[in-house]
A protein has these predicted regions:
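Accessory beta-strand-rich segments of carbohydrate-active enzymes
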Residues: 39, 47-48, 105-215, 237-238, ...
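Extended acidic/polar, glycine-enriched regions
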Residues: 168-171, 231-322, 686-688, 692-693, ...
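Short flexible loop/turn segments that cap and initiate beta-strands
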Residues: 58-59, 241-247, 260, 288-295, ...
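Short, hydrophobic beta-strand segments
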Residues: 164-166, 276-286, 684-691, 782-802
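Extended substrate-binding grooves/exosites of carbohydrate-active enzymes
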Residues: 68-78, 153, 198, 206, ...
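Beta-strand-rich structural segments
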Residues: 230-234, 299, 650-653, 699-700, ...
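Short proline/glycine- and polar residue-rich coil/turn motifs
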Residues: 153-156, 168-170, 264-272, 676-680, ...
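Extended carbohydrate-recognition surfaces in non-catalytic/accessory domains of CAZymes
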Residues: 32-133, 192-195, 584, 642-646
Length: 827
């Protein structure tokens, strides 16, 4: 991409008008506008195939009632035999194939499932065109209305629209049927299964804005004004011969209309496009700290009368990339402090929920994260809405696989027919989001290794540039030398390297146009609250408990500990930053316990566990990424009855330059950053600390030697009671409540090795949605009402129909647990 194309502009997010207009309730001039009705809520569902499941007369009396968004697998029992895969993962450096268990989460995602729902629109809507819009359906979706086949869309992560007009009957019940099927060996991680994102029924006037039909940029921005360029695509099925025009109003973040323009549309073959430039005076910029969002209100006029209305969220901001100057947002350099995120939401699975996703992003922001990579697929569009609102940058990724096989039944089966459609759909859906700053066309694709792979990269990159020339094209490259030698990276605007910090300088020298960053870094693994001795760095960790030490010294054979990546960045300031693998633990890929007789269902890679509880590594990144904010974290815990008198190293992760350790009041010396060895710059370490019951205290000092902060960790006594903490008191509907339960001693100290079984009960309209403890080896179903604590903690997810009115109680009822006092919270 030319440098001038890398100087991009404002982008924004389309949001269709989400209120259903009944003709009797609104003025006549508005009755013809688009009505957009969410189909979330109750559907009928049948697990397994059904002969004649599409028929109008299909019997659903034995079907399950579920709420969409829905993941049919997440609440079921785990089984390590589900979707076993026998595969050689070249990307991981494997020389031969081996059996993999738990790769897709050990849950029953494979197979077919049917959904049915009755749709109705009043006769007053007659004359409109009717569409159904899916934000995502996993996978191989086929849709029927009133027994008639409407269409299909196989890529489960793609959003799509199908036209129901021909078969829709106004004023009558319409029978919608959706068949989904997930083949085996189709994914490398937990995909989820079902209609796992939002669905909408949209009735549009004959003349209307097309789906994803606006494209807004800001080619010129100054302190005094911003030029807003809006392309609006209009469909006209009316054959009325009436004059069509578009009136665009710009609404400020405070809700005031600050500019307006009307332009004619030349209709040809039923379609037309308006291109408008509108000046915004004294614009409020979209920034990471103050993510101001404007709205473009688009009205389609027919002979001057409004017939359709469409809303687009966007932000006024500029982005640019430079080989040496880095990434700039509104003219100021920003280093990517990013994480990769799979799409599952832990114990609630792949069924998207805004409150759960918001919670994840809030936790990551506290760590210092300013960017996410949607690994390795288009996300739920509402996730990007959240990034827009919260000031988080996003790399949106399209594919994990092209033509060459990574999974036997993966995207390679779809590429030739669907890649262009899927990529265009992603681009048109997401190109108005100000948070999106780059497009990824692939991750670790084998095409890097063959000369002809460059052609496929060019094919996809050309589609991206045609749809949005304002943002760069990238990909995650793990076969670095092949990608450079075969010219694969020459088709990219930004060269993303996966786990290659020692190659940054070589590529920089070989490719004079290359702009480089770490698209996937670290892959350090750990289990929250688990510590193994002796402490040692390992690239192939294994332990009899199927856990990984949280001293943050273990990683995969293909990867590194965080300090290796940081060295590559610090020595090469041209590097744009990194996207760590991963922000959260996720379902599937339970390395290193991912084969044979191992029992593990979820990954160990996250800086945050599956519950949303930070691991120690969270604070290692926080200390680096938020140097102006106090971080003082001490590990391990100090409850080791079996280690009295033994060396038990103490680590401190802090933004302060030095700290002193005290064991039961005795100083173990001061450690300063900048010491020898790989970890000297980032960790303060007392290798010779000896365990004795009591307490450890770390006192941090500022650069001038003054005491700045202190942190004490005490030896815990016997479990005495449960502590319960809800993240909110008001919830219900789609808003979930996340309840943290901790086992503490009589003085309130966390019992870090407690694994008591905790039972939950609710009353009123409060219901238990899921339980999770963050232990990758625990196969208790998420939908149970009991679960063991892991490292002294447990998460309960609550839901309610309507505003929550009731309570939740947590009690330990296992053998010998009678002395542990229960806890509850009322809503």
């Amino acid at each position: 991409m030319k440098k001038d194309l890398l100087n991009s502009e404002l982008h924004m997010m389309k949001k269709t008008f989400c209120m259903f207009f009944l003709a009797a309730a609104v003025p006549a001039a508005f009755a013809y506008r688009t009505s957009d009705v969410s189909l979330g809520g109750e559907w009928f569902f049948h697990m397994g195939d059904v002969a004649g499941g599409e028929a109008v007369s299909a019997d659903t009396s034995g079907w399950e009632r579920v709420k969409v968004p829905h993941d049919w697998a997440i609440g079921k029992a785990f089984d390590m035999n589900y979707d076993k895969q026998y595969v050689q993962v070249v990307q991981d450096g494997e020389k031969k194939a081996r059996e993999r268990t738990g790769r897709t989460g050990a849950l029953p995602t494979v197979g077919a499932g049917w959904y049915r729902k009755t749709l109705e629109l009043p006769k007053s809507e007659s004359g409109k065109r009717v569409y159904i819009q899916f934000d995502g359906a996993m996978s191989r979706a086929k849709v029927w209305l009133n027994g008639e086949y409407v269409g299909e869309w196989p890529y489960g992560y793609a959003s799509f629209e199908l036209d129901l007009t021909e078969y829709f009957k106004f004023g009558q019940p319409n029978k919608l049927a959706v068949r989904l099927e997930n083949p085996p060996t189709a994914s490398r991680w937990y995909s989820g299964a079902g209609i796992f994102r939002d669905v909408r029924l949209v009735a549009k006037p004959q003349t209307h804005v097309e789906n994803w039909g606006t494209y807004v940029t800001t080619p010129k921005i100054s302190g005094k004004s911003a030029t807003c360029r809006i392309e609006t695509s209009v469909a006209d099925f009316s054959d009325s011969g009436k004059k069509v025009s578009v009136r665009t109003s710009i609404i400020s973040p405070s809700g005031k209309t600050v500019a307006q323009k009307t332009s004619g549309v030349e209709i040809s073959g039923g379609r037309g496009k308006a291109v408008q430039e509108i000046e915004i005076k004294s614009p409020e910029l979209w920034t990471l700290d103050l993510p101001a969002l404007y709205t473009a209100r688009t009205e389609v006029l027919s002979d001057g009368e409004p017939v359709d209305e469409y809303f687009t969220k966007f932000g006024v901001r500029s982005i640019s990339y430079d080989r040496d100057g880095g990434f700039k947002l509104n003219g100021k350099r920003v280093q990517f402090k990013g994480v990769c995120m799979h799409h599952d939401l832990g114990p609630i699975g792949a069924a998207f929920n805004v409150s759960a996703a918001r919670r994840q992003l809030e936790i990551l922001k506290d760590m210092g994260v300013n960017a996410i990579r949607t690994s390795h697929n288009p996300p739920a569009p509402a996730l990007l809405d959240l990034c827009d609102e919260m000031g988080i940058l996003a790399q949106v990724e399209a594919f994990d696989e092209w033509k060459m096989v990574k999974c036997e039944n993966g995207y390679n089966k779809l590429f030739d027919k669907w890649a262009k459609k899927d990529l265009e759909a992603m681009m048109r859906r997401d190109r108005n989001h100000p948070c999106v700053v780059m497009w990824s066309i692939g991750n670790e694709v084998p095409e890097q290794t063959v000369p002809e792979g460059r052609k496929t990269a060019k094919f996809l990159a050309d589609i991206v540039r045609a749809e949005d020339p304002t943002r760069p094209v990238t990909a995650g490259c793990d076969r670095n030398k092949h990608a450079v030698e075969h010219g694969f990276v020459d088709e990219l605007d930004l060269v993303g390297f996966n786990y290659k910090p020692f190659y940054y300088k070589e590529c920089y020298d070989k490719k004079p146009r290359a702009i480089i960053y770490g698209s996937e870094t670290a892959s350090t693994v750990s289990s929250r609250g688990v510590y193994h001795f002796p402490t040692k760095e390992s690239k192939n960790p294994w332990s009899h408990d199927y856990q990984v030490t949280s001293y943050d010294l273990a990683c995969a054979p293909w990867s590194q500990v965080p300090e290796d990546e940081w060295k590559g960045q610090d020595e090469n300031p041209f590097v744009l930053g990194e996207f760590v693998w991963t922000g959260f633990d996720y379902l599937g890929e339970p390395f290193p316990y991912d084969g044979g007789d191992y029992v593990a269902k979820s990954a160990y890679f996250g800086a945050v566990d599956l519950c949303g509880f930070p691991k120690d590594r969270f604070y290692l990144y926080r200390a680096r990424w938020r140097p102006e904010t106090e971080t003082l974290h001490v590990l391990p815990h100090w409850t080791w009855p079996d280690r009295v008198g033994q060396k038990t190293p103490v680590y401190c992760y802090t933004n302060y330059p030095k700290a002193e350790l005290f064991v039961n009041g005795k100083s173990m010396g001061v450690r300063e950053k900048g010491g020898a060895g790989k970890f000297g710059k980032s960790r303060l370490i007392w290798e010779d600390a000896v365990y004795e019951p009591g307490e450890i205290k770390v006192v941090a000092y500022s650069a001038d030697g003054k005491k700045a902060a202190e942190k004490t960790v005490k030896t815990a006594g016997e479990p005495a009671r449960l502590e319960i903490k809800a993240d909110k008191k008001k919830f219900g509907g789609e808003e979930l409540c996340f309840v943290e339960v901790s086992i503490v001693d009589k003085d309130g100290n966390l019992c870090p090795r407690a694994d008591n079984i905790i039972y939950f009960s609710t009353d009123g309209n409060v219901k238990l949605r899921a339980l999770c403890n963050g232990d990758p080896t625990d196969l208790t179903p998420f939908g149970s009402n009991y679960m063991r604590a892991f490292s002294g903690k447990l998460l309960a997810v609550l839901e309610a129909d309507g505003d929550a009115r009731g309570s939740v109680k947590a009690a330990s009822g296992g053998k010998g647990d009678k002395a542990i006092k229960s806890a509850s919270v009322k809503f």
